[in-house]
């Protein structure tokens, strides 16, 4: 049987899909029911919110609405090293996104699942961002592994 040809393969005899790097080694627990992402506009230029993005999951006590705010590397660095910064714990990061979330425009309605207990691969982060996130005391069950 021949190789399955899909589109223009440029004489390539191998078929690959996906990417080669895993984000999670293991996920054990997540926050119940995903939340609506509140800061989609921060991610338009990137086109997606990658799996493993640090986030703050919250539930409105009055309405029960679940929300998630995802943080960029720049926001994390600013919280730790910016002038008058209050430290990484001030962001309220209590989880990391489970999967990639595609973002088409600032009007995209997106939801995400926040993992609160699991093993995440450290190579998914810049070294300085990983060191800052390891100091976060609001998400102690997510372990950075090599």
Indicate residue ranges for each PLM-predicted region.
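Surface-exposed, low-hydrophobicity beta-strand/loop segments enriched in small/polar/acidic residues
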Residues: 1-146
């Amino acid at each position: 049987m021949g190789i399955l040809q899909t589109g223009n393969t440029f004489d390539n005899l191998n078929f690959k899909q996906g990417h080669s790097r895993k984000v999670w080694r293991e996920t054990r627990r997540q926050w119940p029911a995903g939340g609506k992402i509140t800061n989609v506009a921060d991610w338009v230029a990137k086109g997606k919110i990658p799996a493993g993005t640090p986030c703050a999951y919250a539930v409105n006590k009055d309405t029960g609405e679940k929300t998630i705010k995802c943080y960029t590397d720049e926001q994390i660095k600013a919280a730790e090293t910016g002038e008058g910064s209050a430290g990484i714990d001030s962001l309220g990061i209590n989880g990391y996104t489970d999967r990639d979330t595609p973002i088409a425009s600032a009007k995209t309605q997106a939801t995400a699942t926040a993992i609160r207990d699991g093993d995440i691969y450290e190579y998914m982060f810049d070294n300085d961002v990983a060191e800052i996130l390891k100091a976060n005391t609001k998400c102690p069950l997510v372990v950075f592994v090599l």
